[in-house]
Amino acid sequence: MRQRADVEVGPLKSGLLFSYMQNFCALQTRLRRPSRTTELDTMDFKPFLTLQHFRPQGFAGDVLAPGASYNQTWNTMASKFNGRGGNRVETGKVLEAASESLKETVPLLQLVVRARHHPLLVFLVGLFLGTIYLLYRYWDCAVGCERRPDLKGPKGLPLIGNLMWALKNRDPLSYQVYAQQKYGYGNTHTLPGLGRLIDISRPDWIEHVQKIKFSNYVKGEQFHDQMRDVLGDGIFTSDGERWKMQRKVASRIFTVSSFKAIITQTIREDCALVEQLIETYARQGTVFNLQELYFKFTLSSFVKIAFSQDIKSLSEPDRPDTFGDAFNYAQKVLDMRFVQPWWKIAERFNETGRKMRAARKIVEEFTTNIVEARRKESEAMGEKSKPESSRKDLLDLFMAYRSSDGQRLSNQQLKDTILNLMIAGRDTTAEALSWMSWHMLTKPDVYDRIRHEIDATLEEEGEQAGLEIDYDVFEQHTAKLTTFQETLRLHPSIPKNIRRALQDDVLPNGGPRVRKGDLMLYSDWAMGRNPDIWGPDACEFKPSRWTDQETGSSIKYSQFQAHFFNGGPRLCLGQKLASYEVVQLIHHIFAKFDLELIDLGPGRSAGFGKVPDYLNSLTHPMKRPLMVKATLRCCKEGTR
C-alpha cells in the first residue's frame, strides 16, 4: 500500500534522502569539470550508501514505492553521469571510495535500523547504559546525592548509600555516638529517598539551625508526607504560617492564670486517683507495670486539661487502652518509615500496613468523638458562648480561632491538632517519669535524697497539706527537679530529629558546607553522652551537676546544651506543665509508698543489671515493662 514518505520512512530516512539529493546534484556538477578526481575521493558518499540499508524504493513525487536494488540504482546513476560527456569516472573508483565510508557507517546504522523492529533491545541497551552512568555517578552514595569528599562518614554502597546499615542497625542512637567518635562532628550518611544526612549534634550548630538561621531549616515536605496519615498538619509536622498559627493559639493555655485555674487542680485530682490505685495494688500485693500507670495518668490529665473530658483511664484502669495501644503502634511505624524509602508500597501489602490501618482507624475514632461532641455542644448553645470568665480549654481556643478571611478550622484540622498535642502531653511526660523512677529505684543515693526532701515538706506543712505542691513554689523542690532534668539529659523524650536546608549554608566554627536539600540530623540522646559537652562523667547519672555545689543554687544551662525541651522559636510550650506534673506526682507516690523494682528476667521487664532498652519510636519509651511492687509507708521514718 502506498504511503506518504514522511510516514513510511520517518525522520531519519527523510533526512538521508534530502542529503542524497544534495550530493547527487553536486556529483553531477563536479563530473562535468576537468580534473576533479581528487574531489571525488574526498566526497561524502554516506547518504548514497545508507540507502542500501533501507528497503529499496522508487521515488515518485512525494510518495515512495518499491523500486530497484541498490546496485541497480548505483549503476544507473554512474551510467547517466558517464553519458553526459566531459571527464568520465570509473564506477570502480567510486565504489572503492564508497566502500571505505561504508565500513565506518554500516555497524551503527545497522543497529539503529534494526532497533526499530526490536523495542526490547532498545530498552535493554538503554537500561544497561543508564545503569553504567548511575553506578559511575553514585558509586559510593545514594541516588540523588552529590558526592562530598569533604565530609567524613562510612562509605556507602553504589546507588543505595548507607541503606543496608540503616536496615540492619537495631540501635540507631548508640550508633550515632559511635559514628561521632569515629568520624567526628559533621559525619554524613546517604539514604535513598531521604538524601544526605549531616550529623550536627553540637550546641553551636543546633543553635545556628534552630535559631540563627531558623527560616532556612524546616521539617520539610518529605517529613510531612511520612507523618501525614496520622499527624496530619499539626504543630509537630508543619512549618511556616501553619505552624505559627498553632503555636500562637496553643500558647494561650500555658499561662500562669491557666495553671492556677485549670492545670494545678486537674493534676492534683489525677494524682489522688493514682494514689488510690497504688494503694489497692499494695494491699493486694500485686506487681504492676509502673510505666503503663504513668501513661494512663498523663493521658487522663492532658485530655482533661486540653479537652475537658474524662476518659476514665484511672477511674476504670482495667478497661483496655485501645487508643493508647493504637497510638503507640502508629508512632513506631512512623519512625520506621525514615529508613524505608519503599514504605508506601510495602504497607499496601504487608502485615505492618494492615496493623497500621487498624491503628489509624482507632486513633481517628478517638479524635472524632472529641471534636464532634464539642461541635454538638457548641451548636446546642446556639448564639450563646462561654463567658470570658469561664474556663476555656485548648479545644475552645482552637475552635474560636478565625483566619484573616474569617474561616474557622475544619474538623480534620482540629483532629490533627489534638493528636499532635497528645504526643507532647501524654507520651513525653510518661516516658520521663518511667526513666526517672528506674534511676531512683536502682540508685539508693538518688532515692534517699528525694525521700528526704519529701519528708521535710510533710514535716513542715503537715501530712495532708504537704502532699499538695503549689505551682508558685514547685521549682523549690530541687531534689526532684534536678533528678528530672538529669533524666531528660540521658533519656530525652524526643531523642532524635531532623531539619532540611532550603538554601546552601555553612555551619559555624569550622563546620561543613550545607547544600540545598541536605538533612540536618541531631540527637539529644547522643549529646547527653558527649564528654565534650558534659565532661568526662557525661554517661553517669548525676543530678548534682544541676546544682552549684558552693552556693546550692540551680545551674541554668543553655537551651542548646540542655536541649531536651528543644530550642529557639520551637522551644517546648509545655515544659513548665511537664516539670510541675512530674514533681507533683513523684511527691505524691513516694510520700505514701515504698516501691521495689521487680526483675522478671531478661527480655521480660526492666531489670537492675543495665539501663533498660528503649523502643525505637518517635519518642523514647522503655522497650519492656517497668514492674514494681508497692508497700504502704507506716511512718516517715520508714525510709530505705
Curated annotation (Swiss-Prot):
Bilayer disposition of the protein: Single-pass membrane protein
Residues engaged in binding heme: C572
Disruption outcome: Results in complete loss of ustilagic acid production.
Glycosylation site residues: N71, N350
Q: Which UniProt keywords apply?
A: Glycoprotein, Heme, Iron, Membrane, Metal-binding, Monooxygenase, Oxidoreductase, Transmembrane, Transmembrane helix
Main localisation: membrane
GO terms classed as biological process: lipid metabolic process
Name the EC number(s): 1.-.-.-
* Required co-factors: heme
According to the record, what induces this protein's expression? Expression is strongly induced under conditions of nitrogen starvation. Expression is positively regulated by the cluster-specific transcription factor rua1 that recognizes and binds to the specific 5'-T/G-G/T-C-G-C-A-T-A/T-C/T-C/T-G/A-3' upstream activating sequence found in all promoters of the UA biosynthesis genes.
List the InterPro entries.
Cyt_P450 (IPR001128), Cyt_P450_CS (IPR017972), Cyt_P450_E_grp-I (IPR002401), Cyt_P450_sf (IPR036396)
By sequence similarity, the record places it as follows: Belongs to the cytochrome P450 family.
Role, per record? Cytochrome P450 monooxygenase; part of the gene cluster that mediates the biosynthesis of the glycolipid biosurfactant ustilagic acid (UA). UA is a secreted cellobiose glycolipid that is toxic for many microorganisms and confers biocontrol activity to U.maydis. UA consists of 15,16-dihydroxypalmitic or 2,15,16-trihydroxypalmitic acid, which is O-glycosidically linked to cellobiose at its terminal hydroxyl group. In addition, the cellobiose moiety is acetylated and acylated with a short-chain hydroxy fatty acid.
Q: What is this protein called?
A: Cytochrome P450 monooxygenase cyp1
Q: Which organism is it from?
A: Mycosarcoma maydis
